[in-house]
Amino acid sequence: MDPTIRLDQLPNHPPGNPGLPNAPAIRLEAITGRTTAHAGEATTTEVLLRIIGGGQPVSGARVPLNLCLVIDRSGSMDGQPLAAVRDACKHVVAQLGPTDILSIVTFEENVDIVLPAKHVTSPEIISAYIDRITAGNTTNLFDGLYAGGVQVTSVPLTGYASRLILLTDGEPTAGLKDPASILRQVEQLRAQGVVVSAMGFGPDYQEDLMASIARTGGGNYTYIAHAGQVAAAFQRELTGAMSVVATKAVLRFELPDNNQLAGDIDTMLPDIEAGTTIERLVTIKSGPRGTGMYRILKASVDASSPATRQPLRASADAIVQFADAPNASSAPRNPAVSAAMGLHSAALDLEKTLNGMRTMSFSAVDVTQMLNRTQAMLAQTGRVQEAAQVADATRAFQTGNQDHLEKTLVGTLYALDLGKTGGPA
């Protein structure tokens, strides 16, 4: 067998078989859009990569958490919003154990370390600290994020799933306010192995900034429309963090000669959780070649196990049969790949719609039609939650609720770009 181009037989392991014997936590599948192509011409093949989190950490015991809650307590959070956040924080504390590490930072004009990073051995005392959180004045997001980063990185990160959850209801109004400085902080935390998730509360925060924080930090972006949604948002984050089976995951590609990867692909992956699947759609351009079975792509995922502290690897090959038949490239496309391509188109349409609304480039009729079309496409491809979000955004558009509309659509776009399914609802 030619290890670089031609395959005289299929590899001796199926796609998705982990590349290392000590890597049961992750699997990788490579699904080609079409398994045949015309040998005599240049061809384009879509390949759907599925990174699957399987099983549980070793012995079924979850990985300890190193969790930091960074909470906005500016004046606009006074009343029901801050009360709901306090209750959600106490609910988080109740689910942690003595092997977990928790820190809590609040910010307004000034920053307070409510709880320095420590093991959760006295949840009642921690809850009492949380009850003392009261509203202040302005919003110093930069310093709050910095202080949270200091806490979460003050303990050895090996052996923990480290996560920082940021919640704010407004724009930065004190301290450093420029997005570039804020995102540099997040980038540094991510490089140290800390996942940063961002929650925006109410109608007044900058949704694009919060989504960028989550994207840079490898975490989740959540839009919380009202106080009644706070508890569920915190629970989703906690459940996901408790289910992590692989961290620091990176997607890698090996392309044999005469094959090229089209477009840009984000190779940094979010933490992989048990029961979740992360999808990435790539396009391979192949030049003319002789007939036979060829590998057009070898993909692998390198990660780290927070449970065993050992490296993980999973790999898979994309295989195409090149035949001397002009119609070989017109075979029906794999349904899963077709669905992934449909999702990609839906995301592009949604981004176009959002930008058009912001610049008032589309009429109300055009916007409604575009949103309805995107909703239908999402429903057809099984993304029921995202379809419901677009339906909610459509109602907001029709009633003139621009803030809710934009924040909802940014959240939907973020979820589609993340490409993750399964896990906590």
Task: State where each predicted segment sits.
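Beta-strand-rich interaction surfaces with strong enrichment in secreted/lumenal proteins
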Residues: T35-T36, T267-I272
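Membrane-embedded alpha-helical bundles of multi-pass transporters/translocases
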Residues: V245, A249-V250, E254-D257
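Low-complexity, intrinsically disordered segments enriched in Ser/Thr together with acidic residues
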Residues: E273-G292
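Short beta-strand and strand-turn-strand segments in soluble, beta-rich domains
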Residues: R27-E29, D257-T267
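OB-fold and OB-like beta-barrel modules that bind single-stranded nucleic acids
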Residues: L48-R50, V282, A299-D302
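Exposed acidic/Ser/Thr-rich ligand/metal-binding surfaces
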Residues: D2, L20, E29-K248, G287-G290, ...
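Long, acidic serine/threonine- and proline-rich intrinsically disordered regions
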Residues: S286-A425
